Amino acid sequence: LDTSPKWQAVFSGPTVVTETSADYSGFEPMRFEDPELQKIYDIGVKTLADCTQDVFEDGPKRDRRLWLGDLRLQALANYATFDQTDLVKRCLYLFAAMTTEEGKISANVFVKPENVPDDTFLFEYSLFFISTLYDLHQAHPDEELIRELYPIAKKQMNITLKMFDENGKLNPDENYPVFVDWSNDFNKDTAGQAEMIYVMKQFIELAKVVRDSE
């Protein structure tokens, strides 16, 4: 929308209603002697609360999608604050329920007006499904949940392993790129290699839970 340069809109006494599904009832905030650190912490908690809706959204001022990379970090912060495990589970199930025919997990999901997986696929974002599942089990052990979602996690690992040669070296796929950072002015192969090692260790622990020896 646009207006005439000779006219402008003016709002008098505007009000804003904020929404969150974050539960403050059991939340005990941390206290720091350093006032700057305290302010950073308080703003961080408020931002997490603003992103805590039907899912962990990608920021209240952004596109409000559910991104797997963001979910991993938001879930970790959630365990140290509001500790709403049901919301983490909901997000994991959303991703698990909307894989491609090949079994790939989308990097993000639109949740309004209906749940729709995006057609963006990123190397480490699919792997972070494993990380988020592992972190949840570390915070709140749930073998039944692991058994139910393990096949999806294993599928992500198997798909990704096809990108490595017999010497364990990553062969990048432009259709399944390593993200790491918005900049494309540097080689991301080493970062992808490190991410795979990081997630592989977590996957092995999940495999032990379900007693998968393969």
Feature roles, as predicted:
Residues F186-E214:
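Active-site neighborhood of glycoside hydrolase catalytic domains
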Residues V55-F56, E166-K169, L206-S213:
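Surface-exposed helix-capping loop/turn segments at secondary-structure junctions
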